[in-house]
Amino acid sequence: MNWQSEWLRVEPIMGSRRISNFCWACITSLGALGFFLVGIPSYLGKDLIPVLPSQQIVFVPQGIVMCFYGIAGLFPSFYLWCTILWNVGSGYNIFDKREGIICLFRWGFPGENRRICIRFSMKDIQAIRVEVREAISPRRVLHMKVKGQQDVPLTRISENLTLREMEEKAAELARFLHVSMEGP
């Protein structure tokens, strides 16, 4: 869902608000809550939730371990929910021919560096490079070669584009920037 005119190209970047993150956040939250809700009643000696019987679980050591697993599981689930809420990693790439500037903007974690904006001059762009590694989980990443710096990734590693889509995206961008395209 890119937007492009003669002088400007904007590419939105999806962040943490993906279905897989929602699924993992729900799974870890429910799992941690389940462990905790089985461990606590073993200490109290009565069931809080009839579906989760805890009469057969002795508090020392099983109940303590269940509570520990429940509390420990809440940390990664809290982290996942926060990254989803803050949409960490989302942003956009702006290629502006009039100003001669490329701006890569991403949202980070709250704090002093929440807004991450990296600017390059279009004169410093040497090429657009496609990195392809075929394996069990293929890796297809679009890079921008910048003079005197490391290659800058323009797509996420987990972005599941086919090889054809990746090449088309690279070719469009290379044409827009008037630079060469390097393939695998």
UniProtKB/Swiss-Prot annotation:
Keywords, in A-Z order? Chloroplast, Membrane, Photosynthesis, Plastid, Thylakoid, Transmembrane, Transmembrane helix
GO CC annotations? chloroplast thylakoid membrane; photosystem I
Output the Pfam families linked to this UniProt entry.
Ycf4
Task: Report the transmembrane regions from the record.
Answer: 22-42, 64-84
GO process terms (BP)? photosynthesis
Its placement in the membrane is given as:
Multi-pass membrane protein
UniProt key word Membrane: yes
| SS bond partners | none
Q: Where in the cell is it found?
A: Plastid, Chloroplast thylakoid membrane
Q: What does this protein do?
A: Seems to be required for the assembly of the photosystem I complex.
Which family does this protein fall into?
Belongs to the Ycf4 family.
UniProt xrefs under HAMAP family? Ycf4 (MF_00437)
Q: What is this protein called?
A: Photosystem I assembly protein Ycf4
* Organism expressing this protein natively: Huperzia lucidula (Shining clubmoss)
Upper classification of the source organism reads: Eukaryota, Viridiplantae, Streptophyta, Embryophyta, Tracheophyta
Query: Which gene holds the coding sequence for this protein?
Result: ycf4
